[in-house]
Design a protein with these regions (language model features):
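Conserved SAM-binding strand-loop segment of SAM-dependent methyltransferases
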Residues: 68-85
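A short acidic, Gly/Pro-enriched loop at the edge of an enzyme's catalytic core
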Residues: 86-98
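Conserved class I S-adenosyl-L-methionine
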Residues: 19-29
Length: 246
């Protein structure tokens, strides 16, 4: 998918990858960012962690497929939560870069999250985060119980773009922050939503019952409603690059 490739290329550029780093991806999803990095940078070494059993099982299957980029000996997978034991599990002061794509929305204690990252990074290391943000502060988006967001992303919130950029972290200095217009997300989601209904005869009722169809339809409606207002200026992505203080 070209849109995903463009997204990953931009993220790699903005985190200033040289291609020989030891990189840790927090909350790795199903490993598609890792696949891109391993295929693009032949000397990069990647570690990734997930707390999802389904994702871990899927990734392990991929790692056992010799034709898959994740079968590389430059990739390591960990299973667990992000907590006080994380640096013991993953390696203290080990990584040149620590990143996350679509994770920070579910982090309840941002300061503690960055303390964990501080323990994982080498001196002068850097950390990059890509997340959904709003341009302005929207109170109901800060409480997962107030919108459908919490139903699909447990504990999930949408922070205003300036929140992380202006946060005074003890061990980090902001290098640069970018607001990415949300209209491209809306266009992609709109196509997925159309494909969902255009192919309904293939999935209903054999693979999905009416309850699951309703669940996923509401998901698409929710996401499209987030990114469409003001032609993508109301909500989009925030991208943040920090350097660890010396």
């Amino acid at each position: 998918d070209q849109a995903q490739l463009d997204k990953f290329t931009l993220i790699a550029e903005r985190m200033k990858l040289q291609g020989d780093e030891k990189l840790l991806n927090l909350g790795c999803g199903f490993g598609y960012f890792e696949s891109f990095l391993l295929s693009t940078y032949p000397d990069i070494q990647i570690s990734s962690i997930t707390h999802s059993k389904d994702q871990h099982e899927f990734l392990t299957t991929r790692m056992n497929d010799s034709s898959d980029p994740l079968s590389s000996d430059r990739f390591q997978l960990y299973f667990g939560e992000l907590d006080s034991n994380t640096s013991t599990l993953l390696g203290k002061s080990k990584y040149d870069v620590v990143c996350s794509v679509g994770l920070v929305e579910q982090i309840k204690n941002i300061a503690l999250f960055f303390e964990i990252i501080n323990d994982l990074l080498i001196e002068n290391g850097r950390t990059f985060h890509h997340l959904i943000v709003s341009r302005d502060r929207i109170p109901q988006f800060l409480d997962p119980e107030e919108t459908l967001i919490g139903e699909y992303f447990p504990g999930g919130i949408i922070l205003p773009f300036s929140e992380i950029k202006n946060y005074k972290f003890e061990h980090f200095e902001i290098d640069e922050a970018w607001f990415v217009n949300g209209i491209n997300y809306w266009q992609t989601l709109n196509k997925w939503h159309a494909n969902f209904w255009n192919n309904m005869h293939l999935i209903y009722p054999e693979q999905m019952d009416s309850k699951r169809v309703d669940h996923w339809n509401k998901y698409f409606v929710l996401c499209k409603a987030i990114f469409r207002p003001e032609d993508g200026q109301a909500c989009g992505n925030g991208q943040y690059l920090f350097y660890k203080k010396s």
